[in-house]
Amino acid sequence: MITFCIPSKNNLRYLKSCIRSIQQNSHYTNNILVFVDQDEDGTVQWLLDNDIAHITNPDKDCKGIGYGYDAMFKASKTDLVVAFHADMILGPDADKYLVQEHTRGSVVSATRIEPPLHPPGPEKIVKDFGMWPEDIKWEDFNAFAKAQSKANEGRLGKTSFAPWLIDRRDHLGHDPIFLSVFEDADLFRRFVLAEYTMIQSWSSLVYHLTCRGGQFAGAEKLEDFQKKDEKWLYSNQVSMLEYVRKWGGMFKEFGPCEPRPNVKYNIGAEVLNCTEDVLSLEPFLDQLKVDCSYTNYLNTQEGKSSFNIKDKFVNNLTTDIVIKLDAASDGSLEYFNYILSNIEDTMQQVDQFSTYEFGPIQIAVGKKEPVAIKITIHDTDL
């Protein structure tokens, strides 16, 4: 037996079909647990009426999907838990195939079948079984999923994406700096750092209505998919910068949805004739020594970051690696941006305790040791 853990934020319309699919298509007699982050659509009452176990957000502010999963994993009465989304429909026996591939120290993801809203990819199947929960072609989907499961039995990949199954004793905890965007990118890369086995089962299938609680939240008609939710776009931008601050760069992949941890270095920059464009690269840096005012930049970041950005600005750099540039020199900003965006490749070209010039940029390398990323995060408030 496993526990399907489903975060919900005013997702009752989708949650009904999601839970129906788990109840009808599970191979095992499984538990269902819902984390209600926000309820303005009668979610809690419906769960009570249908005797579905749930946890409610204790605060008025939304906690986010990561907090929800951590809370549900802790409350689960089974060790095997599945991180599921409210806009997903479970395929026949999908749970059996997840369990079949699982061992301690592994994370097993199902394969998504999606309607044609996003570009196709080698890690998923694009096929339309309905765009809305009320229009799901249940018989067609179940028949297709059964046939695909049989045809792909034993076929495995390395993609990581919800839904994913794990023994809750192996869970590393979500980082609270990522509210509901990039939280999985961060977690999956820590799974890889912990040397977990990342598995995708092509026999375990779900139909994913695609981001109805995120970038397409509130979509009511097809035209709504032409524009992403404004709140999601804002959260995505904020979380992207937080990811860069933590990991040292944008997230990387070995293949589509195959997480590759970043290699972060301790980097500072000394900048003459500093500009706002230079300051905007702050997320890539641990320290900055500049000759311009950075008050306005700090104001633009206020309340958006869990990092102490103000303390990054110093009079003397103490980082392992120091980059020096004159922002007034031709091409310096382009070189600076390129070096920071490709820092792992740059570090492959240099030796420690050496100085190098890349165009108008000077790099002084002291220690060339990666920064250790904290792998396990547990919220003691849960």
Tell where the protein language model's regions lie, with residue ranges.
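Short beta-strand-to-loop acidic/aromatic patch adjacent to the donor-nucleotide binding site
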Residues: 78-91, 320-328
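A conserved acidic beta->alpha catalytic loop
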Residues: 35-45, 292-298
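Conserved donor NDP-sugar-binding/catalytic core segment of glycosyltransferases
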Residues: 89, 93-132
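A short, conserved alpha-helix in the catalytic core of glycosyltransferases
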Residues: 157-164, 170, 178-205, 210
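A recurrent flexible, glycine/aromatic-enriched loop bordering the glycosyltransferase active site
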Residues: 141-166, 180, 230
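Glycine-rich, basic loop-to-helix element that forms the pyrophosphate-binding segment
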Residues: 58-76
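Short, acidic, metal-binding catalytic loop of nucleotide-sugar glycosyltransferases
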Residues: 20-29, 281-287
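A conserved hydrophobic helix/loop-capping motif in glycosyltransferases and polysaccharide synthases
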Residues: 2-14, 18, 25-26, 268-274
